[in-house]
Amino acid sequence: FLAMHRHMIDGIRKAFPGHPELFAGFDHVPRGQDDPENPMPWRDVRWSAAQLAAIDKLEHIEDHVDEFATEDELGLYIEVPFRWTPENPSGFVADGSSGLHFMLHAQWSVAGSPVNLGIGENLILNRVFWDLHGWIDTVWERYRVARGLTRDDLEYQEALVGQCEEMHDQLDLRPHAGHAQEDAP
């Protein structure tokens, strides 16, 4: 989850190097309608107490690194509020603070929008998509720094390469025989 989003954000930042502010992410997750960070000030922003606790925890991740033994644990906590298992394919996590990524998408989804954050391939055209994913990426980077991890770590490098290969295969971005590309990924 985290490596896939890092690969995606790094790619978009490289594609638009003159506009880093577009992909920097929220400075903080907006808590209410009047919050200056709220990208849709005409809409009310509502969070449950558990979601606010998750936001506070992640915005102060350096004080909570011991709650996540691994980056995978952090990623699962952020990603979605459900965990699929063969026994319970639609099971939810009992911790209501888990799944903030899912809740961030839901908070600013607009039904019927061609760039709805809830579903669809066009969601990457929505500026808020980059605000929320940039924020998550910053939280992950701060976690890594607090753990003494660097971008030179072999496991980190392998995770990014793996996500790159998977994304390029899924999106069919690899050059095909007879169709060489000078700058192929």
What are these regions, as identified by a protein language model?
Residues F1-P185:
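C-terminal accessory segments of proteins
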